[in-house]
Amino acid sequence: MANLKGLMKDTAIYGLSSIVGRFLNYLLVPLYTHYMPKASGDYGVSTNVYAYTALILVLLTFGMETTLFRFANDDRLTPEIGRKHSDTVFSTVMAVVGTLTVVFLLLVFGFIGPISNTLGYAAHPEYLQMMAAVVAMDALQAIPFSYLRYQKRAIRFASLKLLFIALNIGLNVFYFVVLGKTSVYYVFFINLLCTGFISLLFIPDLLKVHWHFDGQMLKRMLSYSWPILILGIAGILNQVADKILFPLVYPDQAQANVELGIYGSCVKIAMIMAMITQAFRYAYEPIVFAKSKDADKTEYYASAMKYFLIFTLLAFLCVVGWMPLLQYIIGEEYREGLGVVPIVMAAEIMMGVYFNLSFWYKLIDKTIYGAWFSLAGCLVLFAVNIIFIPKYGYWACAWGGVAGYGTAMVLSYMVGQKKNPIPYPMRSIAYYVALTVMLTLTMNYVPATYHFGSVVTLIFNSLCICCFVSYILQSDLPLSSLPIIGKYFRKK
């Protein structure tokens, strides 16, 4: 329980930078959807370009974030030697990412003409140049950020993340509201400024590192990381392939960016699941490797999975139930796509479960399994998108995510229970999923059938959510076990 409380504490701190940060970034969605007219397709351009940058970031980091945790954790070393060892791991990882980043920048700036023509940005190659610089700096920042997580410096981590977000929001408000800009150019330009500033703030941390490159360690790292790279590529394609493929396969090319803008803006509401999963990952990943030698590790992993699902399902219900209010996050022109939000959220939950399941092969250094699972899910997603986007548009994108993540999740669970079984509480998990489905149907059916107004709908849906919370408190999380307020409910 102490370890789980520590996990919850770290998740809360990382969540400050992830969940609160993303929530603050929601302020940019109404900003963009108000100042960028739907007909311009500029929001679709932003969605498309950021999809490419997400994929490139995975390529440049080369699975080295997880590799850093795997190689830096060594309980046999004394604290002093352990620090030198972890610095050597960090140095070697940075050498890999730095080399890949330099090669990437040389290729982009050397062949910007053909690249911009191929991707449909011949008129605006500067979009790609700015975002190439952004993703290069993001890749170089990713390893120091991971090192902060390894060192359990959660406050420093969260502070830098939140500073970036504050700068980004402030500059966007200045350019779009004060100066009245309407072009997507300024979205990329502001990102470049903010990313560059945060990169400079890492200089003091980098100066404290005892730099030492280990060639022998690098060989073992690459052997460990390349399946993670494949896993990462397949995983990120599951997240962004729809946004990359959409302009390529949608029959009306002139309308493609408009439709993609609608989908991209509505997906922002569903991204609360990505926030929770990311915050949980930041806290959980270092702990998993550190706890891998403990006798109670399987029980811990099973409990972590259960509580992850409980809170993501609660978040799902909150978003679905409070949609009459949350819809105002995006501009009125873009709200026609709100129906995809629950579908995308379900896909994100599956992705989170898949992430939790993935540790069985990481802990036994069989990361190749993850590569195969993610590749299978990616192929399913590609097939659904390519076949159905021409007919069903962005609805195919949403269901493609469910199909892709669902495939990877099921494969990982089935193989994992044979190779490295973990006693997940499947009956309890099934109850929570069934209750979530029932309450979701109730919140959609009853207000629509009886023509509730927005206020009455919010009250009714909130009562449904309270039913779910009541079940949690009764079954798995009694008030007496909660931090801070728990002491008031414990028996004397």
Question: What are the functions of these language-model segments?
Answer:
Residues 137-160, 185, 345-376, 416-418:
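Membrane-interface junctions at transmembrane-helix termini in multi-pass inner-membrane proteins
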Residues 73-95, 262-374:
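Specific pore-lining/lateral-gate transmembrane helices of multi-pass inner-membrane transport
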Residues 26-42, 116-118, 233-272, 290, ...:
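Helix-terminus/linker motif at the lipid-water interface of multi-pass membrane proteins
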